[in-house]
Amino acid sequence: MKSLWQEWLGAIAFYTCLPISPRWPIQLAGAAKWCPWVGLVLGGMLWGVQWLLDFLQVPSPVASAVLVALWLALTGGLHLDGAMDTADGLAVRDQQRRLEVMADSRAGAFGVMAAMVILLLKVTSLSSLEKGSVLVWVLVLGRLAQVWAIARYPYLKPQGTGQIHKTSGVFPRDFWPSGLLVLLLSFLLPLPLGQLLFGLLLILLIPAWFQSQLGGHTGDSYGAVVEWTEALLLVAFTVGSAS
C-alpha cells in the first residue's frame, strides 16, 4: 500500500503542477498506471471551474479560453510540449533524424501549428459543450491512451523518464487502476454508449498511428497521444451532444 501511495504521488508530481510536500516520498517507477486517475483529479477541477464560470454568467468563448489556460497551467504544458516536438519530428522526411529533431528544445513551425490546432479545437469545442462532466471523461481517456501506448509499443530511446515508465510497468496487470476507473465513471458519469466506444477506439488508433510514423514511442509522443486524444474527444463529444 505504501508503494502504491508513493506511485500515486509520483504521478501527481510528474504529470501536474499541483504542490506536493517535499516530506512525502515519491516514486516514478510504476507511476504511469495512475495517469487516468490524475486525469480524474484534473478533470474534476476543470469541471468545478466551469460550473463557477457558468454561475457567474461568463460568456462561453471567454469561459472556454479560461478553462484551456487553466488546463495548461495544471499540467505545465507537459503534454502540449510533447505534441509540438512530435509534430516537428514528423515534419522531417528522414526517419533517422526524427528523434534528433524531437529532442531539440526549440519549437519549429510545425510544432507551433500543431499547438494552435490543438488549442483551437479545445477552445471551440468547450464553448459548445453542454455537459461539463464530459471534461472528466476527456482527461481520463486521454491519459488512458498514454497508458496503452506505454504498454503496447516499444520505447525508442535507451534512457529518459519515458523509459522508466516503460520498463517499470507490468502489463496487462497494471491496467487494473484504469479499468477500475472506467467502470466507476460508467456508473457515476455515464456516457452514451456510442461516445464511449468512440473514445475507446481513439485510444487504440492514435497511439497506433504514431507508432506507424515513428516505429515506436518516446516521452514526446506520449504527450502527443494525450493532447490529440483529448482534442478529438472534445470535438466528438460536442458533435454528439449537438446531434
From Swiss-Prot:
Any one GO CC term of the record: plasma membrane
Membrane topology type: Multi-pass membrane protein
EC id: 2.7.8.26
Any one Gene Ontology molecular-function term assigned to this protein's record: cobalamin 5'-phosphate synthase activity
Keywords: Cell inner membrane, Cell membrane, Cobalamin biosynthesis, Magnesium, Membrane, Transferase, Transmembrane, Transmembrane helix
Primary localization class, coarse: membrane
Pathway membership, UniProt: Cofactor biosynthesis; adenosylcobalamin biosynthesis; adenosylcobalamin from cob(II)yrinate a,c-diamide: step 7/7
Localisation: Cell inner membrane
Cofactor: Mg(2+)
GO biological process: cobalamin biosynthetic process
Pfam family, one: CobS
Catalytic reaction list: alpha-ribazole + adenosylcob(III)inamide-GDP = adenosylcob(III)alamin + GMP + H(+); alpha-ribazole 5'-phosphate + adenosylcob(III)inamide-GDP = adenosylcob(III)alamin 5'-phosphate + GMP + H(+)
Transmembrane regions listed in the UniProt entry: 8-28, 36-56, 58-78, 107-127, 131-151, 187-207, 222-242
Function: Joins adenosylcobinamide-GDP and alpha-ribazole to generate adenosylcobalamin (Ado-cobalamin). Also synthesizes adenosylcobalamin 5'-phosphate from adenosylcobinamide-GDP and alpha-ribazole 5'-phosphate.
Record family assignment: Belongs to the CobS family.
Name of this protein: Adenosylcobinamide-GDP ribazoletransferase
Organism: Thermosynechococcus vestitus (strain NIES-2133 / IAM M-273 / BP-1)
Organism taxonomic ancestry: Bacteria, Bacillati, Cyanobacteriota, Cyanophyceae, Acaryochloridales
